[in-house]
Regions:
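N-terminal phosphate-binding or glycine-rich loops at protein starts, especially the Walker A/P-loop
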Residues: 1-45
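Short, ordered loop/turn segments at secondary-structure junctions
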Residues: 9-12, 32, 37-42, 72-73, ...
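Short Gly/Thr/Asp-enriched flexible loops that form oxyanion-binding sites at enzyme active sites
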Residues: 18-23, 103-117, 177
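C-terminal non-catalytic interaction/assembly regions of soluble proteins
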Residues: 226-229, 234-331
Length: 331
């Protein structure tokens, strides 16, 4: 291959720029022209392209967001638009495409591959919910952002003898809530993978207050419950002063952690090598510290396995062990 392209798609995640930088530098090192596509698949359909050089990679590794911009593009699920995108790439002489993003981005890349465009994907999402890699680019930074925020919230909750609900991202996967909850010592962690009982949670909070615990941290993934609604319900049910914080996009932005910068750099370089070596139609992930190249067909077979052992540990370390388990049923 003499000319390849790179795009970022879907939700942004810290470390995307590290991956882009690595893709550019490795492509240039291997004497391959590299083209950037702005705003993901939307930019592909609109032919919003620009040539990239080593100079474009300068100073971006520690920046959040993505220098190529990103967008969600529901239109790209349409087969006619997929064919249009493939033809546009051919018209520009682009022989391969590196996609940086999450599950939806993989679907778009797989569609282009089925139309004869060689593609590889770098898993990049704060949710860490992609099968085929132990960790996705952006997850570590998001977890650190939550841990930092919870530390500040606990200080003020403690000063006022309050319980605090912190709602974090994770509609279908509770990895941010689980990892951050373990790291910051949350008393309760609510995730979509494990339905919980509001009533049991209320009884546990009341029991904790009677035992002298004047504040508790409840980390709630958005897919487990609505944080504000839960807070209002618990206030009425328990008469405990409860504050609710929705962290929102603070989890996506900011300088990537060293871990995410390194991971993005490793996967970016590996993606270029895989594409040029013909290891196409693949997800480039990390498994037990080693680069893993997984065909899309295998990556799409199953969802990432929920960390049941870590969730059980969270219950032991948190308040739930002292009262009844708040889960509706055991794992």
């Amino acid at each position: 291959m003499k000319k390849i392209a790179v795009l970022t798609s879907g939700g942004d995640a810290p470390g995307m720029n590290a991956a882009i930088r690595s893709v550019i530098r490795m492509a240039v090192f291997l004497h391959c022209k590299i083209v950037g596509i702005h705003r993901g698949y939307s930019g592909l359909l609109e032919e919003d392209f620009r040539p990239l050089t080593n100079r474009d990679a300068g100073g971006i590794v520690l920046r959040g967001g993505t220098m190529l911009k990103t967008a969600r593009c529901p239109a790209f699920f349409d087969e006619d638009n997929q064919k249009k995108g493939a033809q546009i790439l051919r018209n520009h002489g682009i022989e391969g495409l590196i996609v940086i993003g999450g599950d939806g981005s993989v679907q778009g890349a797989a569609a282009l591959s089925s139309l004869g465009i060689p593609t590889v994907t770098i898993p990049c999402t704060i949710d860490n919910d992609m099968h085929g890699t132990d960790e996705t680019v952006g997850h570590d930074t998001a977890v650190n952002a939550v841990v930092g925020a919870v530390g500040r919230i606990r200080d003020t909750a403690s000063a006022h003898d309050r319980a605090a609900i912190i709602e974090v991202m994770g509609r279908f996967a509770g990895n941010i809530a689980l990892d951050a909850g373990i790291a910051c010592g949350a008393e309760y962690i609510l995730v979509p993978e494990v339905p919980f009982s509001r009533e049991k949670l209320a009884r546990s909070l009341i029991g904790q207050m009677k035992e002298g615990r004047t504040n508790s941290i409840i980390i709630c993934a958005e897919g487990a419950d609505d944080g504000r609604a839960l807070g209002d319900w618990l206030k009425e049910r328990t008469n405990i002063d409860i504050c609710t914080t929705i962290l929102g996009f603070i989890q996506r932005g900011g300088r990537p952690s060293a871990r995410d910068s390194i991971l993005g750099s490793l996967l970016g370089a590996a993606a270029v090598k895989a594409l040029l070596d013909g290891q196409i139609t693949s997800l480039i992930g990390m498994n037990k510290g080693e680069i893993r190249i997984l065909p899309y067909s295998e990556a799409a077979k199953e969802k990432k396995i929920f960390k049941k052992g870590l969730y059980t540990l969270a219950g032991i370390l948190g308040a739930a062990q002292e009262d009844e388990d708040i889960a509706e049923s055991g794992l």
